[in-house]
Each structure stands twice: as structure tokens, then as C-alpha cells.
Amino acid sequence: MHLRARAVMVAAWLACRLPEAPLLALADLAGGAWYRLATSRRRRARRNLTRVVRWLADHDMGSPEVRAAARDGRVLNHLLRDAFRHAARYYVQLVRAPIVDAKYLDRWLVIETPGVIEAALGDQRGALFVGIHMGWFELPAMVAAARTGQPALVPSETIGDPALQAYLVRTRGVLGLRLVELSSAKRLLKAALAEGGTVGLLGDRDITGGGIDTEFFGAPSPLAAGPALLAMDSGITPHVFGVWRDAAGVYHVSVEPIPFPVEGSRRERVSAYLRAEAQAFERYIAAAPEQWLAIFHPLWADLEAALAHVPVRPAPSASSAIEPAP
């Protein structure tokens, strides 16, 4: 067994047996250090977050703090540091996933749209959920598995370490999640829906390279085409969800159906669906943009091009102004 896999297993074993509060406090410290040290990651996240908060402010969306971040560099810096802390917290929760059970979900998860979720899971044709990399985004799939008694299929990138990959598959299987490799995902997901199963996808990042440019926070961004194609081929209405964490540590999940268009060419229908999906993503991200983990990754081509010509800078202080964004 590789050293990395063994280290992850030991860390997970300890994390599942220690109180959550000190672990999250440690994650906050680690996130703060990460913010200061990860120059390139911080620079990309700043550009992406700046675009998000400015768009939200222009559309009267988001909390007062989020809208203030659009014009006040100190507030933006605070929000950006929180983004690193939330990312660190997510990894802590991820290694603690084996302790998640019905009692845990009842205590730490609030379903804002229970009727919508029940209706989706009650559809005998199957259920298709599409989410974003925000909060603890695996929680809805865990809820679906607990409610239906059947595993929810979730596409996942394969890790180069076989021992670590096997560990992830095993631990997620205990939670009711069946991880499937991206190479065989299309076939397996279609088969699962045909049998009335539950499928969970994430649509805010183009991981495979086949994304379709869609207006997202005011600029074209390649969104994953998989959810749209799966909805079109299966005839099942996708249910888009968002997950965010409140100040008390409680997670909230909200779900809404996004009907797939029935008129127009195949390309027109896919494009129209993705635009409606992106608008739903924008509404969920508005609740807590600092918890949207995708800001650490390439999202918009124009911002990536700008990053290539920006010199490396040290971590900004609380009084620093917003860096310019195209």
C-alpha cells in the first residue's frame, strides 16, 4: 500500500474518533495558512470570486457582505480567506464521511425543499440530480440513498493511487454512493436511470474537456454537457441542487426541477437547458460564494488569459484593494 493511501486512512480513522469542533478549528488554521502560501491558487480564486461578487451586486443578489465585497477590497480579502477555510473544512468533512448516518443527517442537514426531493425520488423512471462544487455537495446523494435504500451512482475521477482509489470506493459505498469511472460513466448512468435508479452529477466545471460555453455570471464558461445529454436521452427532468453551510455548522440543501426543453434542434435544446441550469447555479452560489470550491479552478477563458500576464504577488493584507479583473 502506498504511503499516501495509508496516511489518508490513518487520518480518516482519527478524524472519525475525535470531536468535530477542534478538527474544524484546525481546518480554519490550515485554510488561513493555505491562503497565504498558495500564491497561484489564491490569484485564480481572487479573479473568479471578484467576477462573482460583482455580478451578484449588479443583480441585487447575495448577502450585504457579498455585495460589499464587490466594492471594498478588505471585505473581498476576508471572503477570499474564508474560501480557503471552507475548502479545508470540506476535506475534514470528507474524511469524516464514514460516520455519516441517518442521525447525523437529521442533526446537521436541513432540507429546504423536502417536497421537491420526495417527488424526485418517488419518480419510478429514476431521479437525476445535478449540483455544484459547493458546501458538502455529496450530502444530497447520501440522502437519496438513505431514502430509497438503493445506491446513488456518482461519476468520479480515478485517482492514480490504486489503494487510495479502492479506499474511496469502499468508504463511499458504505454511505450508499457508488462511484463510477468517467470512462464508463455514460453507459452506467443511462442504465441506472433506465432501471429507476438515482444518479448524481456536478455540472459547474468542465472536467472532461467537452463542455459547452454558457453564460455564467455574465461571461461564457464551459459547463459540463453530461447532465444535459443524459436528461435529453433519458427523458427525466433534472433536479438542480445547491448545498451551503451556515454559521452554526448546519448544512442546507435546496433543490429545484429544471425541465429539459422540448422544442428546437438538439443543440438549441441543450444550450437552452444549460442556460437555465446556470441561472439556478447562480442563485445557489449567491447564498455563499465563498463556499463554491470551483473558484479555485479555471472557469472563464478571459480570466485565465489575464492570469497568464499578472506577476505573482504576496498574500494581500486586510486593507488591500481589489485586484483588477477584466
What do these predicted regions represent?
Residues M1-L128, Y167-R170, G176, S319-A325:
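Membrane-anchoring hydrophobic helices of lipid-metabolizing enzymes
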Residues V10, R44, G115, L139, ...:
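Short Gly/charged-rich anion-binding patches and loops
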Residues W34-L37, G62-P64, A68, R81, ...:
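Non-catalytic C-terminal accessory region of glycerolipid acyltransferases
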Residues M1, Y35, R107, V130, ...:
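A generic secondary-structure micro-motif detector
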Residues K103-L109, V174-V180, F216-G218, E263-G264:
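Short, flexible loop segments at the rims of nucleotide/cofactor-binding pockets, characterized by
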Residues R42-R44, T158-P162, P220-A224:
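Active-site metal-coordination segments of metallo-dependent hydrolases
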Residues R89, D123-S183, G209-I212:
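Catalytic core of membrane glycerolipid acyltransferases/transacylases, capturing the structured
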